[in-house]
């Protein structure tokens, strides 16, 4: 019975065990009972005195002894109860604490179990949703295949009906009927003239009739085969014609959309008869194309007319018309990359390149309207560099000095960004900015070094000038583009590119100065930490690739005490707790790169001292 009623205390919470019981009230009742027992003293009544019939003196002494005994017993009993009560109170307190801890542990376990159950439910719900999506996809795919099968069946039925209704099939059916009549007459002749069955003349006639039937059957079969082949060929021709017409319509509609946006700018060339004629020709080509042309010939015609308008507008210095027609060329390159061949044949690339360079030299600043011209060259070179055979000739159409002009520090950051993208699009394993890396003369090498120096100065603009915050964000974004260019250049050109960049001392110095500046920004928390870390790591990687044994001397020859500042920044990146925490998963890589750079810049004793200081 006791075994059945036993329970596990650890499985219950404190609230369940003392449900309905007030322990404080029980403890107070026990204390009250002890105090009442200690205050009670046993005194004999008068009736008891009379029954004893003892002398008064004996009675008084006996009473005193009895009272003292009772008092001592009561006092002893009270002390025991107090002690026992204190023990019970302590046990109750310990039990309460243990039960409270057990309850908290049980609640935590229950909460953890609930969280685990919720996670499992979410996971199963997600899997269920994925399965539902897969089922819906399978159903849709099945319906699609079923529809295709039905269409194929209907097409086959239609083709069969067309073949049956063709004149050749009708003729074959008539010939089959004549053959049946001929065979019936032969059977009738057999039944009536059985005697003449084995005559030679009859056998000869039967043989000739059978030969005619076989020839007729073969001719019908070959006619049906020829009819099917001609029908398939006709269908294929119709489909190809429809496809060409659809391509032509698509090109025309796309160009019409672009042309409609720049028509107002192109109307400026209508002042003279030649310009008006060119404008009307282009307008007719786009809005009313000749349906007999295929898409390739149509695009070529549009390119020829557009190049004539571009040449005319640049001669007349009609800038808006030049920008509008260049937008049309951009649309053509996106619509049909093969149009780059037609564009090159019309000398559009050299025309735009020369126009840009002339305007830059004249005004010493490229207006924002010239973005569209740079975008065109960027798109064109990006497409043209896919064909390595023609790229050597294409680079001759773009002057190398144009690339450096587009990234001058005096320009707006957005314009410099377009220029950097233009340089990236001109980079191949053998070429960069219209310079042949494998066979460059002194003038080409000088222009290339000037280009890299100008691009390196972009990295240190923020360290030398006070720039407001919005514009500073544009420069930081521009730094990413510059770092991307040098990374792409090294990846494509390999060891040749590394050796070219290593001898460009301004580039090495600017990278070191940029590292110190970004390290300061990382500690100042003025910019998002992840952006500073990203650019700082990229700069350290780039410097590690381009570093040489004379790296320290290059920094010493620089201005603004770059050598000690650089060593401090690199040492902080290697050994500083704040920097390593900011680098996160890149901490090990940064430690390796920075310690390698420190070994080049300082002596072993100085490196040991730096490590000790940190």
Swiss-Prot record:
Biased composition (Basic residues): 191-207
Region (Disordered): 29-76, 157-214
Signal peptide region: none
Coiled coil: none
Protein's GO biological process: mitotic intra-S DNA damage checkpoint signaling; telomere maintenance
InterPro entries per UniProt: DNA_damage_chkpnt_Lcd1
Compositionally biased spans, kind Polar residues: 50-76, 181-190
GO cellular component: ATR-ATRIP complex; chromosome, telomeric repeat region; nucleus
Record carries keyword Nucleus: yes
Keywords: Cell cycle, DNA damage, Nucleus
Tagged with keyword Calcium: no
Low complexity bias: start-end ranges: 29-43
Subcellular localization(s) per the UniProt record: Nucleus
Functional summary from the UniProt entry: Involved in cell cycle arrest when DNA synthesis is inhibited by hydroxyurea, and in mitosis arrest after treatment with DNA-damaging agents. This protein is S phase-specific.
Subunit note: Interacts with cds1.
This protein's name: DNA repair protein rad26
Origin organism lineage: Eukaryota, Fungi, Dikarya, Ascomycota, Taphrinomycotina
């Amino acid at each position: 019975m006791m075994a059945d009623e036993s329970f596990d205390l650890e499985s219950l919470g404190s609230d369940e065990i003392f449900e309905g019981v007030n322990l404080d009230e029980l403890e107070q009742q026990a204390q009250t009972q002890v105090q009442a027992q200690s205050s009670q003293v046993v005194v004999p009544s008068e009736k008891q005195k009379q029954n004893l019939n003892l002398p008064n003196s004996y009675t008084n002494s006996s009473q005193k002894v009895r009272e003292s005994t009772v008092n001592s017993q009561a006092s002893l009993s009270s002390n025991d109860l107090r002690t026992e009560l204190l023990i019970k109170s302590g046990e109750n307190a310990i039990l309460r604490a243990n039960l409270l801890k057990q309850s908290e542990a049980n609640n935590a376990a229950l909460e953890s179990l609930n969280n685990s159950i919720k996670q499992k439910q979410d996971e199963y719900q997600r899997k269920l949703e994925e399965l539902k999506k897969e089922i819906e996809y399978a159903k849709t795919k099945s319906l699609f295949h079923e529809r295709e099968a039905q269409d194929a069946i209907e097409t086959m039925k239609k083709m069969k009906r067309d073949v049956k209704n063709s004149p050749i099939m009708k003729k074959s059916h008539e010939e089959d009927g004549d053959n049946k009549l001929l065979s019936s007459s032969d059977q009738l002749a057999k039944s009536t003239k059985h005697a003449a069955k084995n005559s030679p003349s009859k056998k000869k006639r039967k043989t000739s009739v059978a030969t005619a039937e076989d020839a007729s059957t073969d001719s019908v079969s070959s006619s049906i085969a020829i009819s099917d082949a001609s029908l398939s060929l006709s269908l294929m021709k119709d489909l190809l014609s429809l496809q060409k017409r659809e391509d032509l319509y698509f090109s025309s509609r796309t160009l019409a959309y672009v042309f409609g946006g720049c028509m107002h700018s192109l109307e400026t060339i209508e002042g003279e008869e030649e310009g008006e004629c060119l404008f009307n020709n282009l307008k007719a080509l786009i809005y009313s194309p000749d349906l007999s042309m295929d898409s390739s010939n149509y695009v070529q015609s549009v390119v020829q007319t557009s190049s004539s308008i571009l040449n005319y507008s640049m001669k007349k210095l009609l800038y808006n018309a030049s920008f509008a027609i260049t937008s049309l060329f951009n649309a053509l390159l996106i619509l049909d990359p093969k149009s780059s061949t037609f564009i090159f044949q019309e000398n559009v690339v050299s025309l735009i390149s020369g126009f840009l360079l002339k305007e830059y030299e004249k005004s010493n600043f490229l207006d924002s309207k010239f973005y569209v011209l740079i975008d065109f060259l960027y798109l064109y070179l990006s497409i043209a560099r896919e064909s390595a055979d023609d790229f050597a000739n294409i680079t001759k159409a773009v002057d190398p000095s144009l690339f450096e002009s587009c990234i001058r520090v005096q320009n707006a950051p957005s314009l410099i960004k377009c220029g950097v993208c233009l340089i990236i699009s001109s980079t191949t394993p053998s070429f960069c900015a219209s310079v042949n890396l494998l066979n460059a003369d002194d003038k080409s090498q000088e222009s290339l070094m000037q280009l890299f120096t100008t691009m390196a100065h972009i990295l240190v603009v923020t360290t030398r000038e006070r720039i407001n915050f919005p514009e500073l964000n544009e420069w930081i974004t521009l730094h990413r583009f510059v770092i991307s260019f040098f990374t792409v250049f090294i990846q494509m050109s390999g060891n040749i590119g590394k050796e070219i960049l290593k001898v460009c001392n301004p580039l090495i110095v600017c990278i070191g100065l940029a590292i110190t500046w970004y390290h300061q920004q990382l500690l100042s928390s003025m910019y998002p930490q992840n952006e500073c870390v990203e650019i700082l790591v990229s700069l350290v990687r780039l410097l590690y690739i381009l570093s040489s044994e004379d790296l320290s001397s290059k920094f010493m020859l620089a201005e603004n005490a770059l050598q000690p500042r650089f060593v401090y920044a690199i040492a902080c990146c290697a050994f500083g707790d704040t920097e390593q925490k900011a680098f996160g998963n890149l901490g090990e890589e940064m430690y390796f790169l920075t310690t390698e750079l420190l070994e080049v810049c300082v002596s072993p004793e100085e490196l040991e001292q730096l490590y000790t200081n940190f």
